[in-house]
């Protein structure tokens, strides 16, 4: 830029304005933005930075998020969601330690409970201020042992679990629905589950599992689960 000589305070003022403007322009261009991803508890926070010349690669970010969802070594704790979509809430914890090369194992424990609000109408007289029947909210605890392995992108796993229903052995339904008697229900049971997870690509993962349980009364001894998932 060429500045003509004009003399006086106007020239000095113009020169100062150009210098200050150039300072702010360079500062704005070099300012970096930061994208923070919170990984599983116990893992360090991953950070992704970029500027106008280095835009973020969201495919890499998504791939790392899927990878972080796999079981890591050490203590793992999963707390219940504060605002779950489903009224049934769960919390779990486990300890995963290496066994041999790509094989890890460890104990697992979980608690599943009904988070239905007591303000709903039922034939037992429950309300927001009075809970006449504490068994309206059922819960089931699980204690088991799990083995995980890895064969490339395929992650086979197996788990054996002991499940115990807390409280009296009666599931109570809403008014107008039939209830099963205690003799037709199971207070505790064992189940064995085998499954596998696999990354189809850097954006999508597939999973499948087969569970066999004992003491079932509806002749459904097996439970099949299969699907795909993507984490954003």
UniProtKB/Swiss-Prot annotation:
GO terms for cellular component: outer membrane. It holds the Pfam family Autotransporter. This is Uncharacterized protein YhjY. Disruption phenotype: Increased biofilm formation. Residues 1-232 form the Autotransporter domain. InterPro entries: Autotransporte_beta, Autotransporte_beta_dom_sf, Autotranspt_YhjY_prd, OM_autotransptr_brl_dom. Coiled coil: none annotated.
């Amino acid at each position: 830029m060429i500045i003509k000589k004009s003399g006086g305070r106007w020239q000095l003022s113009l020169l100062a304005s150009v210098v200050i403007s150039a300072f702010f322009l360079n500062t704005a261009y070099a300012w970096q933005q930061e994208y923070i991803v919170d990984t599983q508890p116990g893992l360090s926070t991953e950070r992704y930075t970029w500027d106008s010349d280095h835009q973020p690669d969201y495919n890499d970010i998504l791939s790392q998020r899927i990878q972080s969802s796999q079981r890591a070594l050490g203590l793992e704790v999963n707390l219940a969601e504060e605002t779950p979509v489903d009224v049934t809430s769960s919390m779990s914890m486990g300890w995963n330690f290496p066994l041999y090369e790509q094989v890890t194992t460890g104990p697992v424990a979980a608690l599943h409970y009904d988070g239905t609000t007591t303000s709903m109408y039922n034939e037992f007289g429950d309300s927001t201020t009075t809970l006449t029947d504490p068994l309206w909210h059922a819960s089931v605890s699980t204690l088991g042992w799990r083995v995980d392995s890895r064969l490339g992108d395929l992650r086979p796993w197996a788990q054996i679990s002991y499940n115990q229903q807390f409280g009296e052995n009666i599931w109570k339904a809403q008014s107008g629905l039939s209830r099963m008697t205690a003799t037709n229900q199971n207070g505790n049971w064992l189940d064995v589950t085998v499954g596998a997870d696999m990354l189809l690509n850097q954006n999508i993962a597939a999973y499948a599992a087969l569970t066999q349980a004992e003491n079932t009364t509806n002749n459904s001894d097996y439970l099949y689960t299969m699907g795909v998932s993507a984490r954003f």
